[in-house]
Amino acid sequence: MEKFILNVEKRERTGKGIARQLRSKGIIPCVIYKNGQSTPVQIPTKELYTFMNIATREKLFVTLKLDGQEKQAILQDYQVDPVTGKLLHVDFMEVSATEKIRVTIPVVLIGEPIGVKQDKGVLQHGISEIEIEAIPEKIPGHIEVDVSHLEVGDAVHVSDIKFEEGIKVISNPEEVIATVTVEEEEAEVAPSIEETVEPEVIKKGKKAEEEEEK
């Protein structure tokens, strides 16, 4: 797992009003969680954005420097403004270098399937994350899955992924990561009313709403 260092300061005052004041000064309110306990802290916006640009794509093991001590942690959650997209709040989970933790890591598909290149198939994406359990230093930032060998009708499941020793997979092994299907034929011109089928429109996406500051 890639490592990152952030300098943090304790937050003596909390609340929405205080949080807004901090953000106006270029500081983001954050919280460090450990064993059910929480420590309000703050981090300079610029420094935190540099970390977040990587952490939202990779699972990062971060060192938080607080009061002369170093705490090892991972990104647990974050909130953004639903209108501006600006970062509002970040939660970290303090971890032990020797204790196993459960995290989800992103799946990255690489390669172009044979079934797509040669047979005009369509690559369908399944789950985008896999849950694993391991000590922090064993946790990869992401997992790459080569789909170039897939023909039409083939699929890659969680059980097909080979992790290094010391990593336990928690996700359902039968979950589909990717599959290649037959391309749907275009509808005939001027179909009869009985044959007309309205296409289904699937919209994905969810904007995080600001939670009440702790």
UniProtKB/Swiss-Prot annotation:
Keywords: Ribonucleoprotein, Ribosomal protein, RNA-binding, rRNA-binding
The UniProt record lists the keyword Transmembrane helix: no
Region (Disordered): 187-214
Pfam families, A to Z: Ribosomal_L25p, Ribosomal_TL5_C
Gene3D superfamilies tied to this protein: Ribosomal protein L25, beta domain, Ribosomal Protein L25, Chain P
Lineage: superkingdom: Bacteria
Ranges annotated as biased composition (Basic and acidic residues): 200-214
Biological processes, Gene Ontology terms: translation
GO cellular component, one term: cytosolic large ribosomal subunit
UniProt-recorded Gene Ontology molecular function terms: 5S rRNA binding; structural constituent of ribosome
Record PANTHER family: RIBOSOMAL PROTEIN L25/GLN-TRNA SYNTHETASE, ANTI-CODON-BINDING DOMAIN-CONTAINING PROTEIN, RIBOSOMAL PROTEIN L25_GLN-TRNA SYNTHETASE, ANTI-CODON-BINDING DOMAIN-CONTAINING PROTEIN
Family (UniProt): Belongs to the bacterial ribosomal protein bL25 family. CTC subfamily.
Record's function text: This is one of the proteins that binds to the 5S RNA in the ribosome where it forms part of the central protuberance.
Assembly notes: Part of the 50S ribosomal subunit; part of the 5S rRNA/L5/L18/L25 subcomplex. Contacts the 5S rRNA. Binds to the 5S rRNA independently of L5 and L18.
Name used for this protein in its record: Large ribosomal subunit protein bL25
Naturally occurring in which organism (per UniProt): Thermodesulfovibrio yellowstonii (strain ATCC 51303 / DSM 11347 / YP87)
Gene name in the database record: rplY
